[in-house]
């Protein structure tokens, strides 16, 4: 039985994680805590799942690593600098693993994988991500990671910049740019989590889209992370790809 704690247990994602942990046959909920609660309640957990806020997650990780507790993190806002800081924390505390996933939806992970595979074959690639208006960061971690994967695949294939004759624009009209890939973030009431990758070349386009209709859709990926994090070969793992054999 894997003993699990949940940070952000009263949030939309955290409350789903609590239900999933309680329902699974091989996991036991030690404690679910939220803002203002004592983190010491999760001492004794094998793994803690963090769905909190970009402003809180680094301090949470520091505390978990210091106390020898594996972490599965769905909180967004991780750039290269933050990942490097997590690696430094882990170097100081052998025996602890951290899994950070931009998206725990297995279909979303497959969408990112397919996008990276398609990228070398198209001149143009842009990403549109759509989320609920309470999301704190933009672009989403999923869109950022997808852009990184597409950018790397394009670079490996020797592709240059995507064609774009824009010389005059309102600030932000062409979106943000991540590794040469334009990313557009929409925040719409009624949405949960959606992403579309649009590829184009002469005479044809390809669209790869993923839609999460509810937060329950992320739970198989979260539980996979909980079950696998302690045995992962790398101290820090980013994304579910290796857990899925991709």
Swiss-Prot record:
It catalyses: (S)-2,3,4,5-tetrahydrodipicolinate + NAD(+) + H2O = (2S,4S)-4-hydroxy-2,3,4,5-tetrahydrodipicolinate + NADH + H(+); (S)-2,3,4,5-tetrahydrodipicolinate + NADP(+) + H2O = (2S,4S)-4-hydroxy-2,3,4,5-tetrahydrodipicolinate + NADPH + H(+). (S)-2,3,4,5-tetrahydrodipicolinate binds at residues 132, 141-142. Its main location: cytoplasm. Keywords: Amino-acid biosynthesis, Cytoplasm, Diaminopimelate biosynthesis, Lysine biosynthesis, NAD, NADP, Oxidoreductase. It is an enzyme of class 1 (oxidoreductase). The active site is at 131 (proton donor/acceptor), 135 (proton donor). One of its GO terms (cellular component) is cytosol. Its EC number is 1.17.1.8. The keyword Lipid biosynthesis does not apply. It is found in: Cytoplasm. NAD(+) binds at residues 8-13, 34, 74-76, 101-104. GO terms for biological process: diaminopimelate biosynthetic process; lysine biosynthetic process via diaminopimelate. NCBIfam families: dapB (TIGR00036). Catalyzes the conversion of 4-hydroxy-tetrahydrodipicolinate (HTPA) to tetrahydrodipicolinate. This is 4-hydroxy-tetrahydrodipicolinate reductase. It comes from Thermobifida fusca (strain YX). The lineage of its organism: Bacteria, Bacillati, Actinomycetota, Actinomycetes, Streptosporangiales.
